[in-house]
């Protein structure tokens, strides 16, 4: 007994000596989240509908009983051979799954409300993970919540392309094929979804590689041909109103060497500061590329950075192990917020997004403009947000040319006085998953520096005070019909460098 006690004490002392103190940024949550301004009902709570569940798929799955013996609707396989290449692993993968890319299944688990409908349709797709540790059950919490609030949610099975290379175009294409199935379900007499699917109100959610895949799907939805092989034709054109990217990658799929551009739909992305897999907020790149060309129907885009959230806890299967079974040896998991809190955040924001985009409930829009309006609902951590609507008109994005004095809109001029630093450059991400495609935010900004000390060798007291101005042309206000209801917005951030004298 004494040996055991001494051994345990020694182990405790060893662990204490080898484990550094946890370093976290002091939280402003007690102040920032102290108030509740929004008077709408909590969107993260279950709604009035009884939730039903079913599976659809091949009915022949070798590895999962739900897609073999439990399918309520049988679907036909699709030929994905132009989009999926298994390389040297083809034989072993085909043996494990029992099919090749020429006959890949359309499988999904569906949560839906009991009732006549029609109900808006939401698809969610996972990202890359061990193909044997099935990822599609991991969004059950979103399925249960959204179905109770009057949505049909299908968690799409794409485990059979996990571990393959250069497959993220296929990941998006599969989503569109699933939408085609729901269109058929809605029209087929005797189908459980007959007449219950509102195909005019569709949204997509993706996590990790799935977060980029929903952007690919949104782009493919408007195309007639596959960009990498025009012999594959597209005929989709579904009414996708919005997409959500959870901790997404970006740059896995680069058609013609360029990032995919999403157009004319609402967008939400969120990412955790303690993401141990996708270590930078790549969703900001999709956010910045997104274009609002049509000023008719209201649309918006929003981004939220969540302090102490990781990559895997958005999926109940993945959990805290962002880099696999050895995560606890490499990552300090003590700093993570609890999974229940991370999922609570996702429930609030995803549900609010669907309420605004698919049901037109504008009372939830302030959540995206300023998270502080729901301080009493949010988990106690820190958040950084961005927000923009299709009413936004840029004066200066610093993207168009190398002239630092010219703005984006005709007639806008930029002027600096007594600045020690004045340059335009590309913003960088905090880290790079892949140096060739992941180091840049793909977003330009102007960097300004000044020194207004009134004494010392580096004084500027003999010069005018430093200033930077954005000057609007004389007719711009009239051309844009500007009035008191409009506001001027600047996005500012400090740097860690010191300006020159």
Indicate residue ranges for each PLM-predicted region.
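Alpha/beta-hydrolase-fold serine-hydrolase catalytic core, especially in secreted/extracellular enzymes
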Residues: 22-29, 36-43, 308-311, 317-474, ...
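Short conserved active-site loop signatures built around small residues
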Residues: 22-117
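Gly/Ser-rich "nucleophile elbow"/oxyanion-hole loop immediately N-terminal to the catalytic nucleophile
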Residues: 115-117, 166-212, 220
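Short beta-strand element of the alpha/beta-hydrolase
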Residues: 118-127
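Short amphipathic alpha-helix adjacent to the substrate-entry channel of hydrolases
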Residues: 134-154
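Hydrolases whose catalytic domains are alpha/beta-hydrolase-1, hotdog thioesterase
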Residues: 213-217, 278
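A conserved short beta-strand
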Residues: 225-248
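Active-site-adjacent alpha-helix of alpha/beta-hydrolase-fold enzymes
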Residues: 260-339
């Amino acid at each position: 007994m004494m040996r055991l006690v001494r051994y345990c004490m020694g182990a405790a002392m060893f662990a204490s000596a080898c484990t550094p103190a946890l370093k976290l940024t002091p939280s402003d949550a007690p102040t920032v989240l102290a108030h509740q301004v929004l008077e709408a009902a909590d969107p993260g709570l279950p709604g009035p509908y009884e939730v039903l569940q079913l599976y659809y798929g091949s009915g022949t799955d070798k590895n999962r009983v739900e897609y073999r013996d439990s399918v309520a609707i049988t679907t036909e396989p699709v030929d994905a051979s132009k989009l999926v290449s298994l390389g040297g692993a083809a034989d072993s993968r085909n043996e494990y799954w029992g099919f090749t890319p020429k006959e890949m299944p359309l499988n999904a688990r569906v949560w839906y409300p009991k009732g006549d409908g029609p109900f808006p349709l939401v698809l969610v797709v996972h990202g890359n993970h061990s193909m044997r540790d099935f990822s599609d059950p991991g969004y059950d919490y979103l399925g249960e919540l959204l179905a109770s609030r009057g949505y049909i949610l299908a968690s799409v099975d794409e485990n059979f392309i996990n571990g393959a290379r250069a497959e993220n175009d296929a990941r998006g294409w599969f989503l569109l094929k699933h939408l085609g199935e729901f269109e058929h379900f809605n029209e087929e007499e005797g189908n459980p979804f007959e007449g219950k699917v509102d195909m005019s109100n569709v949204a997509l959610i993706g996590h990790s590689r799935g977060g980029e895949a929903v952007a690919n799907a949104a782009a493919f939805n408007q195309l007639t041909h596959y960009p990498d092989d025009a012999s594959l034709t597209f005929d989709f054109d579904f009414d996708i109103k919005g997409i959500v990217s959870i901790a997404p990658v970006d740059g896995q799929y680069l058609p013609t060497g360029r990032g995919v551009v999403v157009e004319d739909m609402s967008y939400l992305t969120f990412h955790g500061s303690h993401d141990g897999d996708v270590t930078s907020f790549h969703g900001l790149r999709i956010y910045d590329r997104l274009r609002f060309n049509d000023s008719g129907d209201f649309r918006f885009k929003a981004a939220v950075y969540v302090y102490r959230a990781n990559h895997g806890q958005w999926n109940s299967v993945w959990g805290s192990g962002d880099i696999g079974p050895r995560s606890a040896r490499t990552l300090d998991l003590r700093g993570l917020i609890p999974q229940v809190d991370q999922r609570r955040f996702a429930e609030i924001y995803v549900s609010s997004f669907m309420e605004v985009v698919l049901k037109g409930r504008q009372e939830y829009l302030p959540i995206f403009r300023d998270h502080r309006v729901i301080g009493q609902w949010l988990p106690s951590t820190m958040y950084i947000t961005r927000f923009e609507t299709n009413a936004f008109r840029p004066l200066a994005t610093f993207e168009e040319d190398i002239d630092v004095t010219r703005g984006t809109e005709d007639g806008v001029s930029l002027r600096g006085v007594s600045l020690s630093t004045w340059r335009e450059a590309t913003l960088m991400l905090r880290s790079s998953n892949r140096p060739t495609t992941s180091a840049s935010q793909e977003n330009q900004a102007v960097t300004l520096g000044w020194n207004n000390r009134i004494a010392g060798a580096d004084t500027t007291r003999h010069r005018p005070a430093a200033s930077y101005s954005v000057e609007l042309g004389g007719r711009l206000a009239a051309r844009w019909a500007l009035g008191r209801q409009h506001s001027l917005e600047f996005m500012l951030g400090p740097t860690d460098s010191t300006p020159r004298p």
